[in-house]
Amino acid sequence: MLAGCVRGLIARGDRVTALARSQSSLSALSESVPAADRDRLRTHPCDYRDLEALAHALRSIPVRPSAAICWVHTPAEPVLELVRALFPDIDLLRVVGSSTEVPRGDGARFDRIVRLGFVIEGDRSRWLSNEEISNGVVSALLSGQPSTTVGTVTPWDAHP
């Protein structure tokens, strides 16, 4: 769902390291990037639930990252803590679903949240498209805002 986000960042000239649980999704991602830009994409298959393997993959990144976009399911805290431990100064964006309670921390931990909502169209609602998710996450990254909602999460009884 974040493939468009990766492509958008690469199109801006950024270098991106993408981690995903399946090699097939990483291969599809790589193939979707223009050949001339693929040198700015590194991929690592890694199940984020295996913290040792994740730490190894993160340590293998050749250039210290300035930002990380983490969309991990519960329990996400160990993954986020590992990213923070390895890269203390990183701009960490945590992507969460519409029903996830947004953490209210001291600002030192997971201080940037991107909450994915839904879209209301007339008397119906729908979940965000992959393109809307990707565009919203890139916008959130570039905005510098501590909290961003893509779409809406209210009224909750209108969700799909």
Where are these regions (language model features)?
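Rossmann-fold cofactor-recognition segment
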Residues: 33-53
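Canonical Rossmann dinucleotide-binding motif of NAD(H)/NADP(H)-dependent dehydrogenases/reductases
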Residues: 1-17
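Residues at the starts of beta-strands that form the adenosine-phosphate
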Residues: 14-16, 40, 91
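The conserved SAM/SAH-binding core of class I Rossmann-like methyltransferase domains
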Residues: 19, 44, 95
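A short acidic, often aromatic-flanked loop/helix-cap motif at beta-alpha or helix-coil junctions
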Residues: 49-52, 100-101, 118-126, 155-158
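Conserved glycine-rich Rossmann-like NAD(P)H-binding loop of the short-chain dehydrogenase/reductase
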Residues: 12-28
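C-terminal helical subdomain
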Residues: 122-159
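Rossmann-like short-chain dehydrogenase/reductase
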Residues: 2-5, 25, 48-116
